[in-house]
């Protein structure tokens, strides 16, 4: 994805941000991973996938020309 020359990221409200975080809505959450492990008599559940889906956030919002979001459907 383009980040408008490294100076743009789509921020809240699909407006231009100051950093190049992959042009996601919440660049600080894109690389976070959450693990929950509960062991006992019940089967072990791993909620890693749920955390990744919640962290995506961008929903197709990416930086276009002139530091604007294209498409703007955040």
Swiss-Prot record:
What is the protein name given in its UniProt record? Metallothionein-like protein type 2
What family does the database annotate? Belongs to the metallothionein superfamily. Type 15 family.
What keywords appear on the UniProt entry? Metal-binding, Metal-thiolate cluster
Chain segments annotated as coiled-coil in the UniProt record: none
A Gene Ontology molecular function term for this protein is: metal ion binding
Superkingdom of origin: Eukaryota
Q: Which organism is it from?
A: Nicotiana plumbaginifolia
What role does this protein play? Metallothioneins have a high content of cysteine residues that bind various heavy metals.
């Amino acid at each position: 994805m383009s980040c408008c020359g490294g100076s743009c990221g789509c921020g809240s409200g699909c407006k231009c941000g100051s950093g190049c975080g992959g042009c996601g809505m919440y660049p600080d959450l894109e690389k976070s991973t959450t693990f929950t492990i509960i062991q006992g008599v019940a089967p072990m559940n791993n909620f890693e996938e749920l955390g990744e889906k919640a962290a995506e956030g961008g929903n197709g919002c990416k930086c276009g020309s002139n530091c604007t979001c294209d498409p703007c459907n955040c």
